UniProtKB/Swiss-Prot annotation:
Key words of the record: Glycoprotein, Heme, Iron, Membrane, Metal-binding, Monooxygenase, Oxidoreductase, Transmembrane, Transmembrane helix
UniProt-recorded name of the protein: Cytochrome P450 monooxygenase aneG
Membrane topology: Single-pass membrane protein
Cellular localization per UniProt: Membrane
Location (main, coarse): membrane
PANTHER family: CYTOCHROME P450, CYTOCHROME P450 MONOOXYGENASE ASQL-RELATED
Amino acid sequence: MNATAQALVLPFITQVTRAVSLSENVKVLGGIPFAEDGTYLEWLSILGFTIGCYYVIYTFYALCFHPLRKYPGPWHLAVSNIPNRWSTISGNSSYWLYDLHEKYGPIVRVAPNEISYSDPQAWQDIYGPQPNQRLGMPKDPKFFSSFEDKKTAASIITSQPKDYMRMRHIYSYGFSKQVMLAKEEMIQGIIDRAMEALRQTKQQPQDIVQIFRATDFSIVTEIVFGKAYHIFDRPTYQPWFKSLMGWIRSTAVITATTDYPLGKLAAWLLTPRSVLKQRNVYLKYVNGEIEERIGESNAGRKDVVQLMFETTDQPKLAESDIRANLPFMVIAASETTTTLMSGMIAHLLNSPDALSQLTAEVRGRFRSPSDITIATVNNLPFLNACVNEALRVYPAAPTQLPRVVPGEGATVCNRWVPGGTKVYVAPYATFRSAENFYQPDAFLPQRWLPENGESFDVDKKNAWRPFGLGAHECPGQVITNLITRLIMCKLLLSFDLELCADSQDWLSRQPVWIVWDKPELLIKARPAAA
């Protein structure tokens, strides 16, 4: 249809230009040629009429002849992707997709050339290995390139399969349990400092989201750069960690405008100035730290940067690879962990029975904070169930990650999809679907226990993929799971928690810009009785 549009419209543009140039009565008003005899307006009207006809024809084509015409969904989404993109810009995309799936079912056409799924089978069909696509379907290049701020090298997000596997090997090891064990003393020290900061509040309301964020950020920067920034004690770095959401939100807007001409300009105009300022603050700090770390010795650092320099994989990673990857990796590792812990504690504080059961499990297992280690926190069944349930009702990464169907086409959920179609699983809609889970909107950790009862037999556990599936599964999930368990155990062992009245509706309709835009979660922490 693009060729058709050109064939219809371009001749009229030429005629308008010619008519104006041939007119003997042309005046220039404000730099615009204007024919006094009305020729210019006449041809301009014809041009407008032609463009209108084109869109009428395109609408007819999209509804009646497009290869996706038989897929369910509202008609207006079949002719325009603007509603879809606006849902991202406005922070409403996860709820918007949820509502569509509730109305139209597990497969919905959400744009002229775009399909969203909440069917568990779609995880495997889209993201899982295929005979001719071992990394799953190709990533949507426009969407994922939006995460890159440096263009000197492709990051792990947009790299080709061979380079991707090489980078993934490094990052998976850098965020592995083995590395965390080597740095456990440092990690425990940061968490203990957070607990001490909470103790010093003397039971006054505190924003637990910011405490989690400062803790996670300090741990991740130690793992990545080989030094912790100790946000609680070094105010110099507080603007850096407080700017994380600015980078995330502005990136979300960029992903929504890449399909349009002048997309970057549109993103700049549609992003609040305060958010753009935060983005610049984040990039200033992180790029400064990257340059400083590159200039330092690798001896004894045992951080991700050292791993990148010393990898035996060929070809070796260059400084440009470090600059391309680390701005995103710092956020991906820290903010998803903060999101998981914030959602988990909010649901626990709104579920007294679950909170009581988890607190009893933690205090029954550990006698002092020193007993809580990386080696011991995984052996708590109800804690594991609470983490899993938090990831279901409040996924750390609720945003859809689009793939593009290969040119030869593919079968997704037993239906043929033509090549070039953008496809994805909508995580929030999938995890909250009654087709996939019993009482999907309730926080019920017991669904993940072996003795969960017959009610949960209907649960489709294969629908639950909080960190993705296949070769592109999140390499930082190990660190997210371990940090969450360490902090939750120390928090519940040391304090009795109370949700403040101002945060009773904290879980209500939070905006989503890649991750949840988390408001203050005010709690009171009373030291637990010895």
